[in-house]
Curated annotation (Swiss-Prot):
GO terms for cellular component: Golgi membrane. InterPro entries: TVP23-like. Signal peptide: none annotated. The chain crosses the membrane at residues 13-35, 40-58, 101-121, 126-146. Keywords: Golgi apparatus, Membrane, Transmembrane, Transmembrane helix. It is a multi-pass membrane protein. The keyword Transmembrane helix applies. One of its GO terms (biological process) is vesicle-mediated transport. This is Golgi apparatus membrane protein TVP23. It is found in: Golgi apparatus membrane. Pfam families: DUF846. The lineage of its organism: Eukaryota, Fungi, Dikarya, Ascomycota, Saccharomycotina. Golgi membrane protein involved in vesicular trafficking. Belongs to the TVP23 family.
Amino acid sequence: MTLWQRLSESSHPVALVFFLAFRLGALFTYMFGLLFTDKFVLMFVLVVLLLAADFWNVKNIAGRLMVGLRWWNEASETGESVWVFETADPQRYINPIDSKVFWMMLYGAPVLWVCLAVLALLKFQFLSLILVFIAVSLTVTNAMAYSRCDKFGKANNIVGQVSGGLLSRAARGTFLGRFM
């Protein structure tokens, strides 16, 4: 079975396509954009726009449709920031293809952006490093929020299967462990 056939079995193919387009579009534009033009500012703006679209899409549409989770941040009456997490009805059918693609890309993108940050640092490309820090902050925020939102452990099961449990055990002992 080809990748296209598997993805066509999605319960929400439009949400899946936009999820992948924004997430991969930002990465590919950052990595290969300067091959097509020498205008760094244009690439910077385009990547930031793709990252913003990805953040909004994941937070408001893809997470709700693909895995039945949603989160937002609001200010309480005392002015404190309060994170609100919402989970769909546990009886709701979650398509395994949607779920696997969502969780793997949700956790995979920040890892790729961190690798690109290390590369930019080693190459002394400090303007690129600013862009990569924006990407890391947006993708990690979504990843941490959805990890906290996932009451039933769907993400932890998928991450455990993919990494053999190494990532989840390592994350529990670090800063990320507070959010998991």
